[in-house]
């Protein structure tokens, strides 16, 4: 059980896929299931020498703190929630990483996890989504931090529809009633 060469992430994902397929067979066919992404703060404020420890922005307190962002992928049918996979993400910016990564063999899973921890949230999210390709869920659900046009387009390429709150910003425009408009203008017309 303590072997670092074993791919525990893949094992957990395979077990959860099997369990989800079992639950899905027992539920009604008209019930929709979703994959849910959540990005939470994993605070490590007292830590000093944790590998890949970074300054991350906490959206609830609107401050930077030491820790990681924990990207979690889960499955739900409306009554049941099952976690499928998660990744601890450091920062993509070198100046925000407080402790560097140890030197490890590039052929190992440990190296791949360290590289993945420094990738963008969107890239890691798509990697997790591709890993869940066998899980029956038509929709991907996430909050407004992910609901950007680039993210929606990339999720659609994975043959999943998106449910999410649109981020209110002046910079992004959507086509509504034949015109390109920002979200505030669309809300005023509804």
Which residues does each PLM region occupy?
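Active-site-proximal, Lys/Arg-enriched surface segment
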Residues: 3-92
């Amino acid at each position: 059980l303590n072997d670092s060469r074993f791919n525990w992430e893949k094992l957990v994902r395979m077990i959860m896929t099997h369990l989800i397929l079992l639950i899905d067979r027992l539920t009604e066919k008209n019930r929709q299931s979703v994959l849910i992404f959540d990005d939470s703060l994993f605070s490590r404020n007292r830590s000093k020498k944790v590998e890949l420890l970074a300054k991350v922005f906490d959206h609830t307190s609107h401050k930077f703190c030491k820790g990681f962002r924990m990207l979690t992928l889960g499955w739900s049918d409306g009554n049941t929630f099952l976690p499928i996979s998660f990744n601890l993400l450091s920062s993509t910016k070198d100046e925000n990483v407080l402790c560097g990564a140890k030197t490890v063999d590039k052929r190992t899973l440990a190296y791949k996890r360290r590289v993945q921890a420094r990738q963008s949230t969107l890239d890691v999210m798509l990697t997790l989504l591709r890993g869940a390709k066998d899980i029956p869920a038509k929709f991907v659900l996430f909050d407004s931090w992910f609901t950007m046009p680039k993210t929606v387009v990339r999720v659609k390429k994975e043959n999943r529809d998106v449910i999410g709150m649109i981020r209110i910003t002046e910079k992004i425009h959507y086509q509504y009633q034949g015109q390109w408009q920002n979200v505030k203008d669309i809300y005023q017309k509804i």
